[in-house]
Amino acid sequence: MAQLWGGRFTKETDKLVYNFNASISFDQKFYEQDIRGSKAHVAMLARQGILTAEEKDQIEAGLDGILADVRSGKLEITSEYEDIHSFVEANLIDRIGDAGKKLHTGRSRNDQVALDMKLYVRDEIDETDELVKKLLEALQKIMEENVHTYMPGFTHLQKAQPVTLAHHVGAYFEMFVRDRSRLADIRKRMNTCPLGAGALAGTTYPLDREYTAQLLGFDGPTRNSMDSVSDRD
């Protein structure tokens, strides 16, 4: 398939270099986030008059089809593609033709991958937080049922003082409460949308970054384009 970069070069990229740069082996896990981000980007482009309503509908239908086929196993993500972005774009063009080539208007793979990573991390945080919440509920139940269940407390592997099972379990309850707080803090810190940052300094297209951020559930857009595409913390 054609590369999404390399217009200045006349010779084909050496296979070793191509394989070294390829990220499909690990960023294929971002396929849902990549498609979600693309749908929001396309909705914004249409709202700004950069795409027609017909083009928007075509692209969205194509993206929905790709998502459904990957989920069902009908479509496989292979090493033929350099990264998840090229996989989605190539399959979209195969499905809907030239309209698919407009998917990347006003966007770089730099701000796109930054978005994918943020969406993925946020999804993982939310999933983990829900699991910790259920764990805390289970621990709470054990504590309530064992207020008068006595056991030895240990220091240095030696029996030291009597405690209740509720108190013992309560120690872990407090630890996991702190873990939930840390997850919430991470989510708050990273919940800004990098789309619109472009390769490093934005774009001349009249994008509405606030609208894209809103569609994707972010608190707002990132404030500095260079930070947006270099931020991996």
Question: How should these model regions be labeled?
Answer:
Residues 1-202, 206-215, 219-220:
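A helix-coil-helix interface module used to build multimeric assemblies
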